[in-house]
Amino acid sequence: MLSKNLLEALNDQMNHEYFAAHAYMAMAAYCDKESYEGFANFFIQQAKEERFHGQKIYNYINDRGAHAEFRAVSAPKIDFSSILETFKDSLSQEQEVTRRFYNLSEIARQDKDYATISFLNWFLDEQVEEESMFETHINYLTRIGDDSNALYLYEKELGARTFDEE
């Protein structure tokens, strides 16, 4: 059985994952508006991944005999000055998610809820990948700078991204 404190934190994180999906869709909308269809697809796939994460937490809460609680999702940032800004904001968002999962893990440890600790380890591993990916994209975009040909090629590369549930 999940403690009240842990259940509250899991519900918060589930809702935060859905907020992250909204934020990535807002980034996709910016990219589409600026005619960067490849980058838009990248962020759409990222949004799918966040929804999958939310669903994974939802399933876990229910599997533990508790109740998943959905809350209002606040509006994400919609104005960006550049593609680079969307990726920098993405990295900040992922760093916040990592911090949140560390906090969740600490609550589970305090509760000696070893099943939840095991469950959360998957997310912690995922966050290492997410932060590394965005740091790499930021580095590439910074190097590309104003080189429109390089940006075009990089957009095409990222536009090929798909998301497969694991």
Swiss-Prot record:
SUPFAM superfamilies according to UniProt: Ferritin-like (SSF47240)
Induction profile: Induced by iron. Repressed by PerR. Negatively regulated by Fur. In addition, is regulated in a PerR-independent way under metal-depleted conditions.
Function: Iron-storage protein.
Record family assignment: Belongs to the ferritin family. Prokaryotic subfamily.
Record-linked PANTHER family: BACTERIAL NON-HEME FERRITIN (PTHR11431:SF127), FERRITIN (PTHR11431)
Record: residues binding Fe cation 1: E17, E50, H53
Name under which the protein is recorded: Bacterial non-heme ferritin
One cellular-component annotation, GO: cytosol
Enzyme Commission number, as recorded: 1.16.3.2
Any Pfam family the entry gives: Ferritin
CDD domains according to UniProt: Nonheme_Ferritin
Annotated gene: ftnA
Residue stretches making up the Ferritin-like diiron domain: 2-145
Record keywords: Cytoplasm, Iron, Iron storage, Metal-binding, Oxidoreductase
Principal subcellular localisation of the protein: cytoplasm
Residues binding Fe cation 2: E50, E94, Q127
Any one GO molecular-function label of the UniProt entry: ferric iron binding
Highest rank taxon of the organism: Bacteria
Upper taxonomic lineage: Bacteria, Bacillati, Bacillota, Bacilli, Bacillales
Reactions that this protein is recorded to catalyse: 4 Fe(2+) + O2 + 6 H2O = 4 iron(III) oxide-hydroxide + 12 H(+)
Subcellular location: Cytoplasm
GO biological process: intracellular iron ion homeostasis; iron ion transport
